[in-house]
């Protein structure tokens, strides 16, 4: 349905040169392949052909536009996801052309909508699965607030590895509702998960002091 990917074509190379890739060192497919191969990743060709190179166990990056993708290992359609979230990427436009990119985005819209809808409906069920895995409510609140700071990342990785159908964003979205207790009345600090706070706050006084420089970064209060 779509044009065959050809990153060797001179026209494509010219177009990519014009947009000045953010990570020029990974402009070639071979370089992107090596980034996966040295970490013993299998079946990586679909990712490297989509312009992506290995960054970390939970993240890959487009060498051209710099967009990062989380929980990528089990993604079946990296090219479509890349085009959907980064429509102005020079690699995607040069590879598929404007018309091909538009067709791909349109065809992916229905799939994406369905996936989000299913995950949204199953959030209560998946919450129970997380509890069954041994994650307490307070612990999950704590991990969410510190998800992007070592050494707590490994717990997010544990969730992903045990429940392959979770996406990183969905896990964060799922866990974030633990700011409000299940009775929807008691509100807890998003860092320690122990101290009760007002509903218009996210952290207790002690955690605000400890995490002052991260306060804006951690200040999210999604409620399901």
UniProtKB/Swiss-Prot annotation:
Start and end residues of the BIR repeats are 29-92
Query: Which source organism?
Result: African swine fever virus (isolate Pig/Kenya/KEN-50/1950) (ASFV)
Would you tell me the Gene Ontology cellular component terms? host cell cytoplasm; virion component
Q: How does it assemble?
A: Interacts with subunit p17 of host CASP3.
User: For binding Zn(2+), which residues are annotated in this chain's numbering?
Assistant: 62, 65, 82, 89
Q: Name one GO biological process term.
A: symbiont-mediated activation of host NF-kappaB cascade
Q: What induces it?
A: Expressed in the late phase of the viral replicative cycle.
- Any Pfam family hit: BIR
Q: Tell me which residue ranges form C4-type zinc fingers.
A: 189-207
Q: What name does this protein carry?
A: Inhibitor of apoptosis protein
Molecular function in Gene Ontology? zinc ion binding
Q: Highest taxon of the source? A: Viruses
Q: What broad class describes the main subcellular location of this protein?
A: host cell
The membrane spanning regions, by residue number, are none
What task does this protein carry out?
Answer: Prevents apoptosis of host cell by inhibiting caspase-3/CASP3 activation to promote the viral replication. Also induces the activation of host NF-kappaB.
Keyword set, alphabetical order:
Activation of host NF-kappa-B by virus, Host cytoplasm, Host-virus interaction, Inhibition of host caspases by virus, Metal-binding, Modulation of host cell apoptosis by virus, Virion, Zinc, Zinc-finger
Localization annotation? Host cytoplasm; Virion
Q: Which family does it belong to?
A: Belongs to the asfivirus IAP family.
Residue spans making up a coiled coil are: none
Q: SMART domains this protein is in? A: BIR
Task: Please indicate if the UniProt record lists Zinc as a keyword.
Answer: yes
